Amino acid sequence: MHYPEPISKLIDSFMKLPGIGPKTAVRLAFFVLDMKEDDVLGFAKALVNAKRDLAYCSVCGHITDRDPCYICDDSHRDQSVVCVVQEPKDVIAMEKMKEYQGVYHVLRGAISPMEGIGPEDINIPQLLKRLQDETVQEVILATNPNIEGEATAMYISRLLKPTGIKVTRIAHGLPVGGDLEYADEVTLSKALEGRREI
């Protein structure tokens, strides 16, 4: 279908977002057109402000509006434990638990040879530099439980083996309240593998 140019540009802009296909982009574009002008201006301003005012923490790589970020700057955090995650959204997920009291290192990606992403393309060199600080005693690898995340965790684990730093991997398994019959084989395998004595 042919749309007026301003609508086409809006649709194209929405389609650049992850998970937004043509149908959803059209729906969003027309939703925006039906919004009050003040709401549209507020939405546009929020987008511009987020892009302008946010950056990556120079210590951990988490998204922040100050440097260092509030987590790295928190004196109550255990600086001896570094949890390595793939993306800033993973930090947010971990923080929602309100249990982890260490600090983070955000890789901003994962090793993926199929996509041409190697260790030097994500924040692994920054991690190694950061770990030269003698206070770090444990690195928790909390990358995603997929091929890229596992490859990244294994790569980092091998790099850190000679350092004497304790390297652990988060367990993957069954969700609380989940039924065994609905779990896939990989999840069941990881749950069994990550079992602990009670």
Swiss-Prot record:
The keyword Glycoprotein does not apply. GO terms for molecular function: DNA binding; zinc ion binding. SUPFAM superfamilies: Recombination protein RecR (SSF111304). Signal peptide: none annotated. The keyword RNA-binding does not apply. Keywords: DNA damage, DNA recombination, DNA repair, Metal-binding, Zinc, Zinc-finger. Residues 80-175 form the Toprim domain. InterPro entries: DNA_Rcmb_RecR, Rcmb_RecR, Rcmb_RecR_Znf, TOPRIM_dom, TOPRIM_RecR. One of its GO terms (biological process) is DNA recombination. Gene3D superfamilies: 3.30.60.80, 3.40.1360.10, 6.10.250.240, RecR Domain 1. It comes from the Bacteria. Belongs to the RecR family. May play a role in DNA repair. It seems to be involved in an RecBC-independent recombinational process of DNA repair. It may act with RecF and RecO. This is Recombination protein RecR. It comes from Bacillus mycoides (strain KBAB4).
